[in-house]
Amino acid sequence: MCAEGRPDETAWGDRIFAGEVSDAYLQRADVQRGYTIVIWRGRHVAEPTELSDDEAARYWLELLRVGRTLEAHLGPVKVNYELLGNSLPHLHTHVMPRYADDPRPGWPFPFPDGEPPPHPEAELRADAEALRRLM
């Protein structure tokens, strides 16, 4: 993640927010509408505990801005914030809107086996543009 810079688009997402210390990418995979990954763009760290208090405060404020914007645009019943890092050791947070009709309400979100299909392009573009405006 450090080496990729701060692109507007990647193979896996469209950037909807470029903050002081983070970028947020709306995911192309059709896992859940609004699924976004917020990536720490300061010095390389793998865990949030490696951030200074000031860095942590700035990251969380930007992360909350993304979450609030997803809530305002999509109206989920809940938003999950997941810091994993098992397969990619760079600080990033999965922001997963949850809806009343999602596959497992009240439980962790079930990720599909294998590569999920892409999100419908027109809906992805419309959501990305709306979220950028709201940021």
Please provide the spans of the model-predicted regions.
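HIT superfamily nucleotide-processing domains
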Residues: 1-135
